[in-house]
Amino acid sequence: MHDLSHFRNNFEKLAERLATRGGAINLDGFRDLDLKRRSAISQAEQLKARKNQESLEIGKLKREGADTAERQKEVRAIADQIVALDEQVKTVDEEFQKLLSGIPNIPHESVPVGKSADDNVEVRRSGEPAKFDFEPKAHWDLGPELGILDFERAVKITGARFALYWGAGARLERALVNFFLDVHTQQHGYTEVLPPFMVNSASLYGTGQLPKFAEDLFKIENSDFWLIPTAEVPVTNIYRDETLEGEQLPVKLCAYTPCFRSEAGSYGRDVRGIIRQHQFQKVELVKFTRPEQSYDELDKLTADAEDILVRLGLPFRTVVLCTGDMGPSSAKTYDIEVWLPGQNNYKEISSCSNFEAFQARRAGIRYRTGKKSEFAHTINGSGLAVGRTWVAIIENYQQMDGSVIIPEALRPYMNAEIIRPERP
């Protein structure tokens, strides 16, 4: 959500920056509403001045003993016009808020201009992809061969885009969750929270999923409950309609949750394996900061997510998304992409974004310094997506005999050094 007065006063500049996102943005509608609102306010102010003047004249005439019935009738008519104009302004303001809620965030000036993922810019790379003495397998072949991943039974139980983990596969998923949380809480300074896995519509509006992305979500019938698409939603909304003390900032929270997505717009993409699922697990990092801190804190949060991959010895690259590839709520986003040898490409494993005050304004999240309060900036990112990290380990650490070496950092959590074939 944008600040109305800032948007109005900087319309041309902001419209130019928004145009770099591409797509249809109803800026003409904003201008038309603004003219309508200004006209109604101007007319109301003129009528109020006239009403005040008429009231003074009536008072004078009364003191002189003159008949003021007609003048009073005119004043009442003016008052009715003022009420009607005030209602018109109120209606326009509601339309403004609805229109503003559908306008994406303004891209930060450091974001490269572009139309698609092809225009994203790589900013750094860590680790070199391993060279295998054999043809590396994709996880959708390797997992079932090891007996740790079962797609057929998952389809029987539920349907497509679900997976069933067995034995060491399930333990590896659990080990990753615990490893992520331990590093972020003990090394990176985050406070762990365990939020509800369902939220209401107000929470989804606050973080920007509603109303635009309703089709990507799962709604519980006959209720206002929705399954969360990411822990970003409940964790950000912890402070909805609250004012933090300035000295508290930055507040750094992390949470493990399952996530649920309909993947309505992903038909034909990542149809094999567990890259794109209706249900998956993720550890999310969320920060609440002062505006002047937020881009430093975005860089730190991104580094915290990257650190997990470094500790696991997984090759990755980090790219800054161009204006045309960013999510609508974000002002700047870094994607961290892990190397998957079985697929011979890099795949997103974390998306780290600064929303500036966009979410905070929608959710009413403020901070106070002295007597002054203003909207906080919110930042979040995956730290990391658990299933995709599982895939990266299986594919990068596979051996010629079909076994998988467990990264050293995970061995205390797995109580093992290698995953060998199991037979469920």
Curated annotation (Swiss-Prot):
ATP binds at R261, S262, E263, E348, I349, S350, S351. One of its GO terms (cellular component) is cytoplasm. Pathway: Aminoacyl-tRNA biosynthesis; selenocysteinyl-tRNA(Sec) biosynthesis; L-seryl-tRNA(Sec) from L-serine and tRNA(Sec): step 1/1. It is an enzyme of class 6 (ligase). Pfam families: Seryl_tRNA_N, tRNA-synt_2b. GO terms for biological process: selenocysteine biosynthetic process; seryl-tRNA aminoacylation. L-serine binds at T230, A231, E232, E284, S382. SUPFAM superfamilies: Class II aaRS and biotin synthetases, tRNA-binding arm. It catalyses: tRNA(Ser) + L-serine + ATP = L-seryl-tRNA(Ser) + AMP + diphosphate + H(+); tRNA(Sec) + L-serine + ATP = L-seryl-tRNA(Sec) + AMP + diphosphate + H(+). InterPro entries: aa-tRNA-synt_IIb, aa-tRNA-synth_II, aa-tRNA-synth_II/BPL/LPL, Ser-tRNA-ligase_type_1, Ser-tRNA-synth_1_N, SerRS_1_N_sf, SerRS_core, tRNA-bd_arm. Transmembrane segments: none annotated. Gene3D superfamilies: Bira Bifunctional Protein, Domain 2 (3.30.930.10), Serine-tRNA synthetase, tRNA binding domain (1.10.287.40). Catalyzes the attachment of serine to tRNA(Ser). Is also able to aminoacylate tRNA(Sec) with serine, to form the misacylated tRNA L-seryl-tRNA(Sec), which will be further converted into selenocysteinyl-tRNA(Sec). Consists of two distinct domains, a catalytic core and a N-terminal extension that is involved in tRNA binding. Homodimer. The tRNA molecule binds across the dimer. HAMAP family: Ser_tRNA_synth_type1. Belongs to the class-II aminoacyl-tRNA synthetase family. Type-1 seryl-tRNA synthetase subfamily. This is Serine--tRNA ligase. It comes from Solibacter usitatus (strain Ellin6076). The gene is serS.
